Amino acid sequence: MFTATVVSAFPPDDTAGSESVLRDPLLSFFSSIQSRHPEKLYLHLNQPYYGAGDTMWFKAYLTDAVSHRPDTLSNFIYVDLADRRGKIIAARKIKRDSLGFANCLPLPDTLPAGEYTLRAYTGWMLNFEPAFFFRRNINVGNTRSDRIRTDVTYTSAQAIVRFADADGRPIRDAEADYELFDRNGKRIEGVRQRTSATGALFVDLPHDSIRNGGYIRMKLDEGGTAFRRTLFLQPEAHDFAVQFFPEGGELVAGVPRLVAFKAERADGYPEDVRGSVLDSRGDTVVSFVAEHDGMGTFLLCPLQGETYRALCRAGEREIRATLPEVGEGACALTTAQAPGRILYKADGTVPPGSRLVGHIRGDCCCIVPVDPRRPAGTILTDSLPEGILHLLLADSTGRPRSERLVFLKRTGKRERWTVTPDKPRYGKRETVRAGIKLEDCGGKPVSADLSVSVTDRRAVRYDSLGDDIRTNLLLCSDIKGYVHNPGYYFRDDDPVREHRLDLVMMTNGWRRFKTRNLYEPEPFTPRHFIERGQYLSGKVIGIAGRAAPEASVSAVALNRENVADAAQADDSGRFVLSGLDFTDTVLFMQRIDMDGLYPRPPLTERPPFPDSAESVRKAVGDYLKQQKLQYATIDGAKVYELEGVEVAAENPRRPRSTAFGAVFDTTILSKFNPISLYNYISFLPTALYFEKKLWLSSRDGPGYVQAQLNIN
């Protein structure tokens, strides 16, 4: 095999070499990627699941997406929790402090049991694909909802919902209402029934597609108590799909090629399959079987002009899938990983002037000329960082002809954690002190920015195969596909695990940034800027619905001093108010001056809501059992959790309406203490204190006029 010399991307101490490097369009491409300052965000949660009324504590780790260093430009992050319909349940905007980003999301005790999506991002990350935001599916249980159990089964035309009490006895002859909605929230029908002798409610499904994202909203009257629940319909159990990925992306005629495959169910989970590859005559060419999480490989020697299809089976289910076509004039990379190096070879027709380019997270680490007569070589990896190495075979115009992902692991070079408590045993409510030590593989102390979660191991069970900060930064955040049980691939350096990790590399593509042409980076025009400080932004729209160009906008905080700013909108009516440094919740009053009609309130932009996905509920049920035990006695006193009731009455003290849409009484004003006299006056109707002046609403038209203030 021919061994190629790896070319350094940045020759040290060579001015002439540095100038030539800057002129290389390949390096200019990756320099352009790094200049966009991409970011990654990971949230360390105190628990993997929660009960209604819990507090979700977390610490966020924000890093540069290329170097994984924490010296990012953003000083604010956004965290929100949404249900499966996309409705935001709780949200926080968090400012960086001396310890980074740490905060919490209190969960309402009335939160229905179900699965929710936790999402975190920065304002700058909105300029990139939402697929690379931090996302995690969170299961939330509710001890009140647990008093009535629901179980759903499906027929070809119905969803059968059975109700039972906490002891499993069916709830018979109870009045129930349900509404059926499609995935877009459109109401399909509403029906009232009485439950059957088995406690069943029968919901007609008008068409198969309703099960893809549709849901049922139910209300059950049991003993004078209204029980409500929303159930999301599950996709057809027999639905699964199989994808095929030739190594290097192409089937080369006459060259044996390793073909990887991945089988997934409709809910995104892997499916174990087996099958056969058939040619155009229906003859079996090769058989295959999944070896790990629906993934596997087989060897295929394709023929020019031949077409191949696969017959795939999962249990009693069977589907047919088509393999990629045999490319005419195709070329494809083949790699083999060995300690400290990667062997590569390009099969097929290699264009003259081709180069092999390698990068890790956008940092170019090698550029190797590829000779079409001897298109093979070696890449040394000892000095490369851990993570996904993306190899691209680019022709003389910069167009990638073949790609391959390889994961680089630092075998046997793991840090060691040691936690030492000050006592072997502790009494009830006794303070626990523990020392935490982090050492490198050589036993030397290592400094770290860390967070620690302490939970009851009888109530909370962690999934050792799930996502953590290492798997997220090195693996999951750089590929767009779903990785099932990512922690499995990092438990040890077993060759079997490394082979299965390579299956993940072969069945997922690099998608953090586009590589259609390495000589011409796609233009990057950010729509959102980096949040170094806090700001308010929006758009001024006139009453006729048109934008209000060059309108003057000002805002002043009603419960903070020296928190105000003014700006002028641009030609499209958009504005930004900056320099607003505050914490906690702040109430702003805005003033808008413009020519023409009185404007509507400024519009503010919200990012798209996240989608939801799969979850596991058994651990949540065990956790709720522990919660019930905790509710039984608190400080030795027995506590009873009462059933929920509905109160159908009107509060006589609540004002029906006001001229200004809000009432500030002494109870509300006491929340803003301490408060200056000037800001106190701002709560008076028609009054506004801004820029050390008192303004009163003008009766002659919209806007404010300056008033004289005398205080005796």
Model-predicted regions and their roles:
Residues 76-78, 88-98, 188-198, 284-294, ...:
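Solvent-exposed serine/threonine-rich low-complexity stretches and specific carbohydrate-binding patches
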Residues 32-36, 47, 51, 72, ...:
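Surface-exposed, low-complexity/disordered segments
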Residues 1-24:
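Bacterial Sec-dependent N-terminal signal peptides
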Residues 68-70, 109-117, 209-215, 385-390, ...:
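Short glycine/proline/serine/threonine-rich loop/turn segments at secondary-structure transition edges
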Residues 696-712:
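Periplasmic plug
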Residues 77-91, 177-192, 274-288, 358-365, ...:
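Short amphipathic beta-strand segments in non-cytosolic proteins
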Residues 71-77, 173-175, 704:
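Short coil-to-beta strand junction motifs in C2/discoidin
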